[in-house]
Amino acid sequence: AVGYGIIADAHGYQYGTDCGYGLLLSDIRYEISGYGFICNTSGEIIAVVTTEITSKNNSLLGGYRASGVRTLIENLINGRSRSYFGIKGQPINSAAEDNYGIPAGLYVSAVEVGSPAYSAGIQTGDIITRIDAKTIENMSDFMDKLNAADSGDIMAVTVKRKSRDSYKEIVFRVTLGVE
């Protein structure tokens, strides 16, 4: 089936383990079990529809921004497995930096037990600021670095960890697993 509508919200973001994807929500009618694509007026795919997002937002058809899942899809098509790090993270916004003195980077909101990050010593509350020589400011930076690596690769991960009255910089060596 083909439906027409407008993008109702383009500002959402959904975070998962080792990933975060931009969301698009539209006012298009949908079938609860349907999958597909949202295209612009030029016929270009701009989102991959998922019922996971759609069902959470009443009658809004939702999907992951195509730009965010492109590398994942290309890797799957080429038979390349996804490297596994094992964290959930969220970017530190500028208000938190300015008002609370929290360093810029990717805040680790959860670490999966038994994951490469867990085994290396990374903890919930750490702020990832660099991987190897690349500055990490958000989940996109993190995913770019992870998508370019293979399982078994060793990454030098720099975090800032809260101590009594400051943040200490710690470097961990994380050996990536396979998802």
Positions of predicted regions on the chain:
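C-terminal cap/linker of serine protease catalytic domains
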Residues: 45-103, 166-167
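Beta-strand/loop subdomains of soluble extracytoplasmic proteins
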Residues: 1-13, 21-22, 67-72, 83, ...
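Solvent-exposed coil/turn segments that connect beta secondary-structure elements
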Residues: 8-13, 29-31, 42, 51-53, ...
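A short glycine-leucine-enriched loop at secondary-structure breakpoints
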Residues: 35-38, 99-102, 116-127, 148-150
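Soluble non-cytosolic domains of exported or imported proteins
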Residues: 1, 33, 63-67, 119, ...
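Conserved PDZ fold ligand-binding element
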Residues: 42-46, 117-139
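Active-site region of chymotrypsin-like
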Residues: 2-62, 102-109
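PDZ-domain C-terminal substructure recognizer with occasional recognition of PDZ-binding tails
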Residues: 74-84, 88, 94-96, 129-131, ...
